[in-house]
Amino acid sequence: IIHAGGEVVFDRREETNNWKGIYQLKPYPIYDAAKRLKRDMYIDGTFMGLSFHIKKLLPIWKGGMILTDNAEAADWFKKARYEGRSEKYYKDDDITFHGWNMYMTPQQAAHGLAMFQNYPEHMSDLGEDNGYRDLTEFTVFKNHRTIE
């Protein structure tokens, strides 16, 4: 959110922090779905981040995915994940913006696809047994607005 120019507002209210599987980064149409992976979970018109960490529902060690129904955003995400490059030969590409080196390796992708072959039809959301440290305790977030 911050790197995209948005404002982060921390909400400490119980009703906001009692989530399971998925939560929205309000007021944006962005959902963190790192603890959910099941059929028909996508919410139209949103950007939904999935995580494939070893402790998540599709444990391929690292990586993730952004679900969206916005074709323009999907094209941008594809370029952004691979240093701003298109899906062309490097010699034929014209890089128009700085991206990141965040693409999934072919081996990781193949492992994930293989795991999907036996993925359960219905999967429960993961909980967060140990919780997360309050981000407002970190110096980098001290000056952000907080709702009590």
Where are these regions (language model features)?
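PLP-dependent aminotransferase-like
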Residues: I1-D40
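Proline-centered loop/turn at the N-terminus of a beta-strand
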Residues: Y28, T46-F47
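Active-site region of PLP-dependent enzymes
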Residues: K38-R39, F47-E148
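Nucleotide-sugar donor-binding and catalytic loop/hinge architecture
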Residues: I43
